[in-house]
From Swiss-Prot:
Gene expressing this chain: P
Segments traversing the membrane: none
Organism the protein comes from: Rabies virus (strain Pasteur vaccins / PV) (RABV)
Lineage: Viruses, Riboviria, Orthornavirae, Negarnaviricota, Haploviricotina
Protein name (Swiss-Prot/TrEMBL): Phosphoprotein
GO annotation terms (biological process): microtubule-dependent intracellular transport of viral material towards nucleus; symbiont entry into host cell; symbiont-mediated suppression of host cytoplasmic pattern recognition receptor signaling pathway via inhibition of TBK1 activity; symbiont-mediated suppression of host JAK-STAT cascade via inhibition of STAT1 activity; symbiont-mediated suppression of host JAK-STAT cascade via inhibition of STAT2 activity; symbiont-mediated suppression of host toll-like receptor signaling pathway; symbiont-mediated suppression of host type I interferon-mediated signaling pathway; viral transcription
Region (DYNLL1 and DYNLL2 binding): 138-172
């Protein structure tokens, strides 16, 4: 009786073909499930639809008048953007601010800069207040009636130095309120392209570029880290350091900078290795303590 010998490579090739066939079948099944995913959900009951869905209607096939369409569009815009007369404006405004806070947290977690987020948020809040809290009608008439008298007074009297100082202080307070919360010390000077400030920051960082700073590590020990380990260009480090609250003001005054706080800030934003090794909660406290100590001097 003759024996039939099978080449092992042929067996391996056959097994590979079987595995590929199984993977192909699985892929086809997944595609079918994905394409039919909308059919697997629970049916929607008409009674459970949102209130806005009740405004939907079917056209009867007749083309509406363009003027009527414009009126409907304007009314819909006012209805969506303005609050109802029967609702409490303060409660709606509080709900709006809560939503704004949630949106800010999401944007910060996604990596966006706080200054950019805050400037956009301020504009949105101002537009919301301007639409939903308009000036009382009596105020505009008073302004018109006092316009002529105001012009005559300007010709006769000029503001004293004390009045100018009070006006400038009020303007500074208004600018500070619009730019952001004062506790965070996010000032508009962080965005200025001041070459002398950048030169001062670069000078102090370059002097301590190789110096090791102590940071809390996740292993309950000490993590030694310096600016060299960032492997970044000095210009990029300076640009990132200007975002640290209070650093621009200290550099403009020629004061000493909290370099450990600056290093921690830049490393957290640009070094994944540093993020894995450092204890973030303790680091935040250390950075805040350094910042408070240097800015209070």
């Amino acid at each position: 009786m003759s024996k039939i010998f099978v080449n092992p490579s042929a067996i391996r090739a056959g097994l590979a073909d079987l595995e590929m066939a199984e993977e192909t079948v699985d892929l086809i099944n997944r595609n079918i499930e994905d394409n039919q995913a909308h059919l697997q959900g629970e049916p929607i009951e008409v009674d459970n639809l949102p209130e806005d869905m009740g405004r939907l209607h079917l056209d009867d096939g007749k083309s509406p008048n363009p003027g009527e369409m414009a009126k409907v569009g304007e009314g819909k815009y006012r209805e969506d953007f303005q609050m109802d007369e029967g609702e409490d404006p303060s409660l709606l405004f509080q709900s709006y601010l809560d939503n704004v806070g949630v949106q800010i947290v999401r944007q910060i977690r996604s990596g966006e800069r706080f200054l950019k987020i805050w400037s956009q948020t301020v504009e949105e809040i101002i537009s919301y207040v301007a639409v939903n809290f308009p000036n009382p009608p009596g105020k505009s008439s008073e302004d018109k009636s006092t316009q002529t008298t105001g012009r005559e007074l300007k010709k006769e009297t000029t503001p004293t130095p004390s009045q100018r100082e009070s006006q400038s202080s009020k303007a500074r307070m208004a600018a500070q309120t619009a730019s952001g919360p004062p506790a965070l010390e996010w000032s508009a000077t962080n965005e200025e392209d001041d070459l002398s400030v950048e030169a001062e920051i670069a000078h102090q960082i370059a002097e301590s570029f190789s110096k090791k700073y102590k940071f809390p590590s996740r292993s309950s020990g000490i993590l030694l880290y310096n600016f060299e380990q960032l492997k970044m260009n000095l210009d990029d480090i300076v640009k990132e350091a200007k975002n640290v609250p209070g650093v621009t003001r200290l550099a403009r005054d020629g004061s000493k900078l909290p370099l450990r706080c600056v290093l921690g800030w830049v490393a957290l934003a640009n070094s994944k290795k540093f993020q894995l090794l450092v204890e973030s909660n303790k680091l935040s406290k250390i950075m805040q303590d350094d910042l408070n100590r240097y800015t209070s001097c």
